[in-house]
Amino acid sequence: MRVISGAWRGRKLLAPKNDATRPTADRTRETLFSMLASRLGSFEELHVADLFAGSGALGIEALSRGAAHCVFGEQDREAIDALKKNLAALGAAPRADVRAGSVLALGPAPRTFDLLLFDAPYGTGAGSVALDKLNRLGWVGADSLISIESAEKEAVEVAGFAIDAIRKVGKAKLTLLRPA
């Protein structure tokens, strides 16, 4: 697994050795960031939340492309260890905040985020549930862009959000949403 673009392009990322997380494939990540770039233009100075972060590949990709800061939410201990090692190896720790624990247990937002990336376990609906909860806790702003990666046939519906785009990549489905 590697960073696709930006300051850290080509740098390898560690992934946890257990089966508790599912790293986003490079092809899926490349498709997602192409979709995001066409809507956001630049990632410069964005505040990003990478939720169900695993090794942090999505948030690190955003930081590599110029995002100002990323909050990472992850509960698996091995994934958190890999994430922290990745941030340290890239010198990205000062622009990151790692929240250990369930994404569903995150409290009120430290701020609203420009971009929220949800990569929950497939088939659980946890991405939609977490978005609904974090929206009520102030994580989502009026102009936020949200990405939920899910299984190809999994429904992604969240009250108060409109679907901006859907793209299928292999067995994954990428859904972009905005506040309605």
What are these regions (language model features)?
Residues 1-180:
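Class I S-adenosyl-L-methionine-dependent methyltransferase catalytic core
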